[in-house]
Amino acid sequence: MELIMLRIVTVLCFMFTFTANASDCFDAAGRDYHIDPDLLRAVAFRESSMNSHAMNIVSPDKYAVGEMQIHSQNFAHLSQFGITPQSLFSDRCMNVYTGAYYLAIAFKRWGVKWESVGAYNAGFSQKPEQKEKRLKYGKEVHQIYMEIKNQKAPQ
């Protein structure tokens, strides 16, 4: 738990040193999808520690790219919008917007709640083990989200 908190604090300190341009991606995506930009930041922190060049390779055909860790299972769907794995990796704002798109789908399907945030990572399967993963992920993102909000609170 201490390691998690240390990681959160370290990345939060780093996160607030980003240029205005980087923050604009979260702010714009949040505005356009009606999602708190800080929630998007919390998801990005949980997914990649805010690393826009993150790659999580499970196998040649199963991998996730970028700050929001967009999974390869979504690439066929995204291709109809002209979004490619390369654009998700090289265009930070495209990656953040795509993450916001999938989070918005979860909110539309299940409402704005932490289990919906968990669906971003663990999907919508009704199997008990998937529900447990959703709840765990939602709780982790909630913790990060609250840390972000506490950092912004007036002192």
Question: Each PLM stretch: what is its role?
Answer:
Residues 1-2, 152:
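Short hotspots in intrinsically disordered terminal tails
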Residues 12-13, 22:
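N-terminal leader/targeting segments
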Residues 23-155:
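Catalytic glycan-binding domains that act on GlcNAc-containing polysaccharides
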Residues 17-19:
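N-terminal signal peptide c-region/cleavage motif recognized by signal peptidases
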Residues 13-15, 59:
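Exposed boundary/loop context
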Residues 2-12:
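Sec-dependent signal peptide recognition
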Residues 3-4, 21-23:
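Proteins with a high burden of low-complexity, intrinsically disordered sequence enriched in S/T/G/P/A and R
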